[in-house]
Amino acid sequence: VLSCTRVLLPLSLIVGFILIVQGTPMGFDGKMKVTTMEGTTQYVSQGPTAAIVPIKQLGTNGGGYFGVNSSHPLENPTYFANMVECWSILIIPMAMAFAFGFYLKRKKLGYSIYGVMLFAYLVGVCINVSQEMGGNPRIDEMGIAQDNGAMEGKEIRLGSAATALWSITTTVTSNGSVNGMHDSTMPLSGMMEMLNMQINTWFGGVGVGWMNYFTFIIIAVFISGLMVGRTPEFLGHKVEAREMKIASIVALLHPFIILVGTALAAYLFVHAPAFVESEGGWLNNPGYHGLSEMLYEYTSCAANNGSGFEGLGDNTWFWNYSCG
């Protein structure tokens, strides 16, 4: 209760007010009829968006009020709103490392853990921003200018750099919200997004904290203890066979789920084409990228993330049950 009233509620109110000022709707009105610049009629959804978006980000939930998530101009209207939402995703997971050091009265340990997490995050940001700002070489070959970088699947009001930053921010946590299409990012960018979720330790999320990172600490302490010939200890407790068995199972379970799921999907795609066709065909991009789409889907589900390579037609019986 205290975490809700002292942390989540105040932060949600602050972020909500900022989003309202930036243009996010807040009310209980139904669809609004508007006339577009082309002269056609369109119905635009409204509702309590500014109340839902803050807790979606602060709680590392990621489920958007609108179907296209934070790509929608009413959910993420401006560049400043985009920055605030990025901050909202990271603030509590980042604070977990400091809270760990504070409550155990070992602040240096908390700082070192935070430093490792931050380093991994910044490496991912640098790679993705440089990849997306550099543009698509295939489009360069056509002689088409890419002054704003690789803009496929991205919002003009945000640009390629902000979308690349968000893609790393949402995958180093268990958030999963998006402000652009991850399936349209450059190959190395997509790899970094997948790698973040496969490691599944950077920052974590609200509810589980950095539980997976703690597992790797236990394994590292045990191995280092064996290397120097002393009994491994962490936080004053011996790390013995029982702890190692639990940590090993937890560490191996994540890749096991991902690989088994991907292998099953790939097998069905090749050996049961009639079943795949009955579900709409699954892949819009067969080949290497199609395999990446299936791998990303199971990686995202196993990491409790929720983002996806949306070239995959995953709203089917098979994908809903296997991912669930």
Question: Where are the model-predicted features located?
Answer:
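Membrane-proximal intracellular helices of multi-pass ion channels
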Residues: 1-324
